[in-house]
Amino acid sequence: MSAFDPQAHSPPRCGPQFPSIGQEPPEMNIYCDSIFHPQTMPSPQRPSNFETADYSTTANPYLWLNGPSITPPPYLPGSNTSHFMPQSYGMQRQLLPNMHGLGGSDLGWLPIPSQEELMKLVRPPYSYSALIAMAIHGAPDKRLTLSQIYQYVADNFPFYNKSKAGWQNSIRHNLSLNDCFKKVPRDEDDPGKGNYWTLDPNCEKMFDNGNFRRKRKRKSDVSPNGQISSDKPEGSPLNESPKNGEHHDMLGNSSPGTDDSSEKRSPPPSITPCLNNFLSSMTAYVNSANPVSRSVPLGLTNEPSDRMGQNMVGLNSYTPLSNMPSHGGSDWSSTISSSPFGYSSSVFNQFTPHFYNTINANNTLYNREGTEV
């Protein structure tokens, strides 16, 4: 039997049925405009009876979005639609392309009709000190009274029109407690009441240009006469004074036995005391005169240092064998002095796990040529 009736073999459908013209439901037609349907879907061009060969020549059994070749049949509202389907579905297809860009009239349903109403609900991202600084900068004379500052904030930021008592108290507290705002008395010939408030020139760097974002106040900007007093150590050349000179002389007299070469090796005075202490400790570590008397590097426990001291005693009491032809006393002395810490490489071979991070690998961890017994 080459042909069959699909109506006889199909089970009964539940719910409302759409017209048998090969159309999908209107919801699918609205939101999936370019769905690639497989070839087996019934269409208006197909007859009611199909051959079995038509089912075997399926191009693609899947649904593909944005199909290039096959598009669904257009939705045709009319008398063929079911009785339960409202007639307004036929107009949704023409309204969807126009919804990509909404104009001002399309937002009429929003509870916020204008931008001013939105600004009343959003708190400005500025501190009270920044608001005062903005008001003073905007004044022609760079000074304003308290009432003028209130008026500036209320006019430019509608958020503060709701409760004036709260933010006005904060404005007064910032004017009295912040050192950046200076009170200027009113002139005798100037009528009115209340003093003027101006911005300290040393505090202008607390705000970025135009942004008025709060920055940490630096002591170098606040100190008078441009002198840097508290951020610099006593030995810095920018802060020379007679007291510092006397202190330097006292340090020089307290150590009369120091060599001139050690003074040349001392690093120049640095800007920060932490860097000065670090450089001085590193210089003393590298340029020490007696390598044997150096302290053990950091990161070693007490146990390896004690063992090292015992090995040092055994090494100092050891005398080289004179009957060996390839190694003499001078060779052993050169071997001991070749190590950066004054120890031979054979001693350091016992402590290699503890010296990986502190000892030069070229001189200590590997034996040099001619040093093995």
UniProtKB/Swiss-Prot annotation:
Keywords: Activator, Developmental protein, DNA-binding, Nucleus, Transcription, Transcription regulation. Gene3D superfamilies: Winged helix-like DNA-binding domain superfamily/Winged helix DNA-binding domain. The keyword Lyase does not apply. The gene is foxi1e. Its main location: nucleus. It comes from the Eukaryota. It is found in: Nucleus. Residues 123-217 bind DNA. GO terms for biological process: negative regulation of endodermal cell fate specification; negative regulation of mesodermal cell fate determination; positive regulation of DNA-templated transcription. The lineage of its organism: Eukaryota, Metazoa, Chordata, Craniata, Vertebrata. Disulfide bonds: none annotated. PROSITE patterns: FORK_HEAD_1, FORK_HEAD_2, FORK_HEAD_3. This is Forkhead box protein I1-ema. Pfam families: Forkhead (PF00250). PANTHER family: FORKHEAD BOX PROTEIN, FORKHEAD BOX PROTEIN I1. Residues 1-23, 208-274 are annotated as: Disordered. One of its GO terms (molecular function) is sequence-specific DNA binding. It comes from Xenopus tropicalis (Western clawed frog).
